[in-house]
Amino acid sequence: MLDIFKAVILGIVEGITEFLPISSTGHLVLVDEFIKMQQSTQFTDMFNVVIQLGAIMAVVVLYFHKLNPLSPRKDTTEKRNTWVLWSKVLLAVIPSVIVGLPLNDWMDEHLMNWAVVSATLIIYGVLFIVIENHNKRLTPRFANLQTLPYTTALFIGCFQLLSLIPGTSRSGATILGAILIGTSRYVATEFSFFMAIPTMFGASLLKLVKFFAHGGSLAGLQGAVLAVGVIVSFVVAYLSIRFLLDYIKKNDFKAFGWYRIVLGVLVIGYFTLIH
């Protein structure tokens, strides 16, 4: 039963951090330092990825009408625009499929550690502050998803590759990239959400396939632990997404940049002292 409680904690962490630009993987790595499951390393590695399914389902539920090209409540033009949006999203995911799949295991093996996480937390924290200060007087070139060109969508997808490095934040990399290219904060955030659907569904499916291919099982407590983590991450992510969308209507991302810097410094201090 203790692992169920830990799954709740990890689900909360995942739900809060998945779509805020502060790195869910980085936070899960850090939380794992203090809350270790009494499960195999194989299961824990799978859990830390598949728990994202709950967060992704929160996006699907929140945007179901907007993302559903078959909705009977949409006219022909709206349905066509939805198909166009999906084509841009899928185009943006292609770089992650081509480059990310071959490198993913290598990145996990060599870069999943506190030193890399703390460095990327600080680096991207600084970038958020610098870019927001630079862009505050500029008018976005793309203020809605309909005007977002295919080439821009592809460039945003290339920025997603940076999130292969632990601690970067998938949403952080894509939002920063989109803002640099000239989208509004709101468009950057929504497009990042939509890119997460195929990206993270694919990552979770791949992790599950590898888990079962290597003899893994979800029998007994393990299945319950995973289910609890996914459900909790769904509920918390739903609330986090609503918060972020309201927040960026009136604020920029600098607060998240400062948070990343402070957390990165604390991580360096903590691990330097205990090791």
Curated annotation (Swiss-Prot):
Swiss-Prot/TrEMBL GO biological process terms: cell wall organization; peptidoglycan biosynthetic process; regulation of cell shape; response to antibiotic
Topology in the lipid bilayer: Multi-pass membrane protein
One Pfam assignment: BacA
Enzyme class: hydrolase
GO cellular component: plasma membrane
Principal location: membrane
Transmembrane segments: 2-22, 43-63, 83-103, 111-131, 147-167, 186-206, 221-241, 255-275
Reactions catalysed: di-trans,octa-cis-undecaprenyl diphosphate + H2O = di-trans,octa-cis-undecaprenyl phosphate + phosphate + H(+)
Keywords from the UniProt entry: Antibiotic resistance, Cell membrane, Cell shape, Cell wall biogenesis/degradation, Hydrolase, Membrane, Peptidoglycan synthesis, Transmembrane, Transmembrane helix
GO molecular function: undecaprenyl-diphosphatase activity
InterPro entries tied to this protein: UppP
Catalytic activity, EC: 3.6.1.27
Signal peptide: none
Subcellular location: Cell membrane
Annotated function: Catalyzes the dephosphorylation of undecaprenyl diphosphate (UPP). Confers resistance to bacitracin.
Family: Belongs to the UppP family.
Additional note from the record: Bacitracin is thought to be involved in the inhibition of peptidoglycan synthesis by sequestering undecaprenyl diphosphate, thereby reducing the pool of lipid carrier available.
Protein name: Undecaprenyl-diphosphatase
